[in-house]
């Protein structure tokens, strides 16, 4: 079977450090660093990934690039007495992943749009960049699209802030079931955050 154009793009992005993507990314990051934290773009950088997540080149769909800090939660060591367990030096689990933070920021920037999904496009020593696909639930083109009109329902509002996107469901532990995930349902907080 003949491989499609999207297949070649996908293969190049699987190992971006070893393909032509590396050189392109080096040039792009120089421009992206000078842009704002949420920047609307004309078309997706990774067209294969965007289309697999539901992107279509039609009215009512917007793509933005979001710049978020890298790294875990910084935690200053307490200078008073603590149990070792409560010092939080070995590990402090963040409530949201970096990708979820990017989705939430895009959601706040465009309050009339709804987050469909997001994907990684680059990183350096300080920042990570994600592209977030946003959909206008009130646009007639979206309302008439049988694949996307589910997002027009009132119950779907605020997907990104409620952890209903792919990154959100993964962070809440909804991607696995059964043994080992007893503390993630009905929610993380219902089990005193032991599921994290």
Curated annotation (Swiss-Prot):
Gene3D superfamilies (alphabetical): Ribosomal protein l15e
Biased composition (Basic residues): 160-172, 186-196
SMART domains in UniProt: Ribosomal_L15e
Assigned keywords, A-Z: Ribonucleoprotein, Ribosomal protein
Pfam hit, one: Ribosomal_L15e
InterPro entries according to UniProt: Rbsml_eL15_core_dom_sf, Ribosomal_eL15, Ribosomal_eL15_arc, Ribosomal_eL15_CS, Ribosomal_uL23/eL15/eS24_sf
UniProt entry tagged with the keyword Nuclease: no
GO annotation terms (biological process): cytoplasmic translation
GO molecular function: RNA binding; structural constituent of ribosome
Family the entry assigns: Belongs to the eukaryotic ribosomal protein eL15 family.
NCBIfam families membership: PRK04243.1 (NF003269)
Name of the protein described by the UniProt record: Large ribosomal subunit protein eL15
């Amino acid at each position: 079977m003949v491989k499609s154009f999207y297949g070649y793009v996908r293969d190049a992005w699987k190992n971006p450090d070893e393909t032509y993507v590396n050189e392109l990314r080096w040039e792009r990051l120089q421009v992206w660093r000078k842009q704002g934290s949420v920047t609307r773009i004309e078309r997706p950088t990774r067209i294969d990934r965007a289309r697999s997540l539901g992107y279509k080149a039609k009215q009512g769909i917007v793509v933005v690039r979001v710049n978020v800090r890298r790294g875990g939660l910084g935690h200053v060591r307490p200078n008073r007495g603590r149990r070792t367990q409560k010092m939080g030096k070995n590990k402090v689990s963040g409530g949201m992943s970096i990708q979820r933070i990017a989705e939430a920021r895009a959601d706040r920037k465009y309050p009339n749009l709804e987050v469909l999904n997001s994907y990684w496009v680059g990183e350096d020593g300080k920042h990570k960049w994600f592209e977030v696909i946003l959909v206008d639930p009130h646009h007639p083109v979206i309302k008439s699209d049988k694949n996307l009109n589910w997002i027009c329902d009132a119950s779907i509002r605020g997907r990104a802030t409620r952890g209903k996107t792919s990154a959100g469901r993964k962070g809440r532990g909804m991607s696995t079931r059964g043994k080992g995930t007893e503390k993630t349902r009905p929610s993380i907080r219902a089990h005193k955050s032991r599921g994290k």
